[in-house]
């Protein structure tokens, strides 16, 4: 009798998991039909110009590097090293957290207004997350893949606040995180529909570890560093119903090879959706 009860329980859990996974797949259907995530919003720099150009080229998924300004507003900047000389902090002011992401004390940073008035290389206009939200209201078909460079809880609370908890905006936010526990933090803030986990060299984990996290947290997208893009790893992900985006890829012939082993899409600086042939 005990064995029968245990067996029934296991079957129920399996059915529940499959229902949840199918639900997540349906929710993410708007995302997975696209092959390209624009790295740094497109063009190698988190800028207004890169964002607009990538959209014009058919790209609809955008990787947004989120940091805080001096006045506590979300701004987009991949690395502080990339904007040295434009603001008052120096290279010596940059320190690194436990996953090797550069940080600067907030008091040394520009305000949101100062940041957004800055043009990198006299051509790229810096943007805030508020700017992105306004564009999301106009472009109803875009999704923002959020890369929280600072505290996850503070970042996602600010995302929701900046979007005025508007479901039309927040339902097109892709929560993309490194740590399993961070998904619990984010789920307590808002029931985001799209979840992705990152497998990069700065936090090494095996495919089995990633798969187990995906099962536990109901994640169905994996953002994989190219160092992990071997046939066995990708096969394991696909066999478990996961959608795989490789990062960062700027060689379209390499992407073709990745697609042959099951990779669904890539994070890229200079490859756009209009360059991709349907497969």
How would you label these PLM feature ranges?
Residues 1-279:
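Phosphate-group recognition and catalysis centered on beta-loop-alpha active-site segments
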